[in-house]
């Protein structure tokens, strides 16, 4: 399993750092501008917002935007996740308790079983449920009308959604990795709210090592703050941040120990040939889903990895970087 600073449970403090309104949301400019139009239009029509699907890598703000939609529309939000909905009755119980204009947020919707998906089809399209009651010859179909609600869903694997489910979302918004300048703006806001005494150069260093991901940027800020609190310093300088990040084994690209384990395995055993995900997962004792969602997207983003149908292959850029790093490790 992944043992990393990048994989930790959200705390109450994490939640308190989330923006509550769309104007306070940092980054994802195109997504935010379009979402504002859709929200304003729904409010002008005095109608429910069309169903919304957010897709993109973890930690970019999909859940935050779902809650912002609820706040902007002044609607109640009900939250659940794909892995929690194992049978049709689970989703039916939630849907029948929704009120008009409520928001239902389903995280990891790509992990819904097909039986649950099929219940959602008529609920999303016509706002009713068709349930089978009883068994055998005595079984009968019952239709239950639902309040007009908005389904907001998030996925890191949009390709795993069935076409019928994906097509029922009227709004699909794709989130991308953040720029360093966007992360810097986010860190400035967070440092002020957390009362962290940090220089601008240190925040730039944090932003560069945050893998383009706000969630990681905030976690690194708090961990570097921990180093500050047990030191003799009273401010986080660039040098202090660099020292703390190096102690946490977060390099200049934001790569951590597991990223190196992944790349080292491929470089040492398959440097000239592609390798399959199952082989990698078995070798580094990690789940395929975790590799595909948490490791590979960023390696592809920075040009370290090529992913094809034949398998994974490290790029020349990655191999050169590993060679430099490994040379530095030698006594």
Swiss-Prot record:
It is found in: Cytoplasm. Belongs to the RuvB family. ATP binds at residues 17-18, 59, 62-64, 125-127, 168, 178, 215. This is Holliday junction branch migration complex subunit RuvB. One of its GO terms (biological process) is DNA repair. The gene is ruvB. Keywords: ATP-binding, Cytoplasm, DNA damage, DNA recombination, DNA repair, DNA-binding, Hydrolase, Nucleotide-binding. It catalyses: ATP + H2O = ADP + phosphate + H(+). Residues 179-249 are annotated as: Small ATPAse domain (RuvB-S). Its main location: cytoplasm. DNA binds at residues 307, 312.
